[in-house]
A protein has these predicted regions:
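Flexible, glycine-rich loop/tail regions that form catalytic "lids" or insertion modules at the edges
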Residues: 1-193
């Protein structure tokens, strides 16, 4: 099935090549921090993007949100789809991500991560409803059918994961173990943030 390419022989090296050269990182960084000239972004957003541009040009003081965007962008650039879902995933709960920005005059949205290259993989960043169990259950199921995708579910705050506890306990934690006896369970590369 779709997971067979991820199996390795017992004792074989499971490490993959994960490095990205500096030139590519800087090119991607430039695209992540570029806003179209005719786009009327908020002054605060302009300042944030200028700070990020400086991080990429100097290689200094790269913060978590910038490193996260760079990680997503390199995966997209290599052909791996990225799907991030949570209550405030586009902006980021602490206003750190700004994966999508809004034109202050037209209301149009711009997603720098969707503009890395012409041949990049699909990016989905979705602000979900406040129904942790339903959303996490869906994302878990989605991750089972899309093994080449990075699927992430983000709890807006850590304790919000409590509302999805049944999914963690009955599906995710026991999924691989029960894979042998139950046909609907299986491996997942999904990430719970």
């Amino acid at each position: 099935g779709v997971w067979s390419k991820f199996t390795t022989e017992v004792g074989s090296d499971r490490r993959g090549m994960t490095g990205v050269d500096e030139k590519t990182l800087k090119e991607i960084g430039n695209k992540l921090t570029s806003i179209p000239q005719d786009f009327n972004s908020h002054n605060t957003i302009k300042r944030i993007f200028e700070n990020k541009k400086n991080m990429f040009s100097t290689g200094q003081n790269i913060d978590w949100a910038t490193a996260e965007s760079l990680a997503f962008a390199t995966l997209l650039n290599e052909g791996y789809p990225v799907r991030l879902v949570g209550q405030d995933s586009v902006r980021g709960t602490f206003s750190q991500r700004h994966a999508g920005i809004t034109d202050q005059l037209t209301g149009d949205k711009y997603f720098p991560l969707r503009n890395i290259s012409e041949n990049q993989a699909q990016l989905e960043i979705i602000d979900s409803l406040l129904s942790e169990m339903g959303v996490l259950g869906f994302e878990y199921g989605y991750s089972l059918s899309e093994p080449d995708s990075l699927v992430l579910w983000e709890a807006q705050f850590g304790d919000f994961a409590n509302g999805a506890q049944v999914i963690f306990d009955q599906f995710i934690s026991s999924g691989e173990k029960n894979m042998v006896t139950c046909k609907w369970f299986g491996s997942t590369f999904a990430t719970w943030v």
